[in-house]
Every structure is written in structure tokens, then in C-alpha cells.
Swiss-Prot record:
Catalytic activity: D-ribose 5-phosphate + ATP = 5-phospho-alpha-D-ribose 1-diphosphate + AMP + H(+)
Family statement drawn from the similarity comment of this UniProt entry: Belongs to the ribose-phosphate pyrophosphokinase family. Class I subfamily.
Coiled coil: none
Functional description taken from the UniProt entry: Involved in the biosynthesis of the central metabolite phospho-alpha-D-ribosyl-1-pyrophosphate (PRPP) via the transfer of pyrophosphoryl group from ATP to 1-hydroxyl of ribose-5-phosphate (Rib-5-P).
Protein's name according to its UniProt entry: Ribose-phosphate pyrophosphokinase 2
NCBIfam families assigned: PRK01259.1, PRK02269.1, ribP_PPkin
Subcellular localization, as worded in the UniProt entry: Cytoplasm
Subunit structure comment from the entry: Homohexamer.
Organism whose genome encodes this protein: Enterococcus faecalis (strain ATCC 700802 / V583)
Active-site residues from the entry: 200
CDD domains: PRTases_typeI (cd06223)
Associated pathway: Metabolic intermediate biosynthesis; 5-phospho-alpha-D-ribose 1-diphosphate biosynthesis; 5-phospho-alpha-D-ribose 1-diphosphate from D-ribose 5-phosphate (route I): step 1/1
Length: 323
């Protein structure tokens, strides 16, 4: 553990989604994880017990709403309610991965905006602040009427590539779609590299998608960047398209390794040399295939918690360590 934190009113609790990350965060802050238990009744109902006094405390609850999404979300809501009823002074939700973020707008008639519904539930339960990481849609910050601190994984991912000598003019940072251009540009700034964009088009119905590459990638080391990888279909096809276009090597990176369904097999079979991910979502050892390298956001989030508690800006955390 780092130096013991000076203020005993700061308390950190972990629920079940990602306890290893919570332990790293608590270690970075300099506190022990708070004592609580989460159990289920035989019918599946969730019960939370806080096993120490938190009256007047500034509480931070660590919980990603990754799979099982609904169980993890319900755990969080029940915990917030318990903290409120136990007279916590502030209830700060630390959600490294915000589930339901892809449902941020009405893409078709009569669709819900579930990302907003989740925000409403968290606020109504009693949260006073949200701390999260690389939201799928940044406008989700505006779904809350409480303060939202939005951290970026790009500096940590950039540090990984810089430490492995992957930077400069021989590198091209690639966005797998139009929506990720801003994210790719940020990583490119850190790596002092140009960017390219993959433009997916379906020429006509029942014809396979064509991947047009906007930018020069021949003979270059390409670094794909996305906020999350779910089934890995897009990222694998993008990597193969870059290789076919003459790329020397292809690396991929994301903040949130959802990696559901056929994702691991697709990554294994693809042209990707290495996939760099963070530990915002817990990956069991059997899912950490050889191609996956993991960097931790524990210190980043721990530093953010200390800055928030001490009323300091979090903007210095948006830079790489290797300047």
C-alpha cells in the first residue's frame, strides 16, 4: 500500500464486478477497502450489508456494470441506497465501465434511451457524484444532474506503446470507424504519429461490406484504438484490411475489454499482433490469451479519487507519463 491516506473520512468499498481493480485503487489512495458483503437469497434477490460505520464519510463505491450487467447494476443501486440510509456525507460512484452506454439515443422509432434511464436510477438512488472512464458516448455526462468526472484510458495505452518503442512517423494510429476519430487523434498526439480512418461501406444490399482505408498505412506499424471491443468483429476485420493494404504490423487497443461471444477466437485468428486493454472490466486468467496485454487503471482512478476528495482538478491526469 502507498502511504496511509491522511483523512479517515474517505472510504472505498468494492462490490462484486471487479474486486482486483478495487484493491489496486484502494492501494493507490492509501486506504483499506471498506467492509461489506453482498449475498443473494435463493430466489436471486440481492442483499448488501455495510459492516462498519460510514456516518459522515465520503464514500467511493467501485463497480463496473459489465457482465452480468443487470446483477452488477442492481448491486450498485442497492449499495447506494444502503449508504444513503446509513448517513454517508457523499456517495461517489466509481464506474470504470458504464454498461448500457451504447443505448444513448433513439436509433429507431420506439426505442428506449437506456443510458439515460441508468443515469436516472443512479441519481435517484442517492449518488452525489459519478467517476467513469471512456464513456462510449461522451454526451452521457449530460444525462446526469450531479458532477461527472470523465477519465481517459488513452494516456495509459500511449505509455504502453511508447515503452515498447511504438511511436513516431513509422506508426499510424487508426480509427476503425468515423465515430472514433477524436479518440484516435488523441492517441496519435501522444505517439507523435499520423492517423488513418477505416470507412466501412456496403455498396448495395446483400453485398459484403468494403473497408476503405483513408490514410497511408503501407509499410507502417498500425495501432487500432477503440473505446470497447465486444465481439471483436469490427476490430478483427479492420486489422486484416490493414494487413492486406500493406501494413507492416497491426496492434489493437481498447479501454474496455468486453470480449463476449466469439471475441477471443476472432482475435486469435486475426492479423493483430497484440491487443492492449485496461482492467476496467475483470478478465479471468483463462480469458487472458497470449495476444492480450493488460495495463491497470488502478493508479489513475486512485489519483482521481484523491484529487476529487481534496478539491483539486483532475485534468493533470489527462497526460502521459512519457512526455
Amino acid at each position: 500500500m502507498s502511504k496511509h491516506y491522511f483523512d479517515p473520512r474517505l472510504k472505498i468499498f468494492s462490490l462484486n464486478s471487479n474486486r482486483p481493480l478495487a484493491e489496486k485503487i484502494a492501494d493507490a489512495v492509501g486506504v483499506e477497502l471498506g467492509k461489506c458483503s453482498v449475498t443473494q437469497f435463493s430466489d436471486g434477490e440481492i442483499q448488501v450489508n455495510i459492516e462498519e460505520s460510514i456516518r459522515g464519510a465520503h464514500v467511493y463505491v467501485i463497480q463496473s456494470t459489465s457482465s452480468p450487467v443487470n446483477d452488477n447494476l442492481m448491486e450498485l443501486l442497492i449499495m447506494i441506497d444502503a449508504l444513503k440510509r446509513a448517513s454517508a456525507k457523499t456517495i461517489n460512484v466509481v464506474m470504470p465501465y458504464y454498461g448500457y452506454a451504447r443505448q444513448d439515443r433513439k436509433a429507431r422509432a420506439r426505442e428506449p434511451i437506456t443510458a439515460k434511464l441508468v443515469a436516472n436510477m443512479i441519481e435517484k438512488a442517492g449518488a452525489t457524484r459519478m467517476l467513469t472512464l471512456d464513456l462510449h458516448a461522451v454526451q452521457i455526462q449530460g444525462f446526469f444532474d450531479i458532477p461527472v468526472d470523465h477519465l481517459m484510458g488513452a494516456p495509459l495505452i500511449a505509455d504502453y506503446f511508447i515503452e515498447h518503442g511504438i511511436q513516431g512517423d513509422d506508426v499510424v494510429v487508426v480509427s476503425p470507424d468515423h465515430g472514433g476519430v477524436t479518440r484516435a487523434r488523441k492517441l496519435a498526439e501522444f505517439l507523435k504519429a499520423p492517423i488513418a480512418i477505416i470507412d466501412k461501406r456496403r455498396p448495395k444490399a446483400n453485398v459484403a461490406e468494403v473497408m476503405n482505408i483513408i490514410g497511408h498505412v503501407e509499410g507502417k506499424t498500425c495501432v487500432l484504438i477503440d473505446d470497447m471491443i465486444d465481439t471483436a468483429g469490427t476490430i478483427s476485420l479492420a486489422a486484416n484490411a490493414l494487413k492486406e493494404a500493406g501494413a507492416k504490423d497491426v496492434y489493437a487497443s481498447c479501454t474496455h475489454p468486453v470480449l463476449s461471444g466469439p471475441a477471443l477466437q476472432r482475435i486469435e485468428d486475426s492479423a493483430i499482433e497484440r491487443l492492449v486493454v485496461t482492467d476496467s472490466i475483470y478478465l479471468s486468467d483463462d480469458r487472458k490469451i497470449v495476444k492480450i496485454d493488460e495495463v491497470s487503471v488502478g493508479e489513475l482512478i486512485g489519483d482521481a479519487i484523491k484529487r476529487i476528495h481534496e478539491n483539486k482538478p483532475v485534468s493533470p491526469l489527462f497526460e502521459t507519463k512519457n512526455k
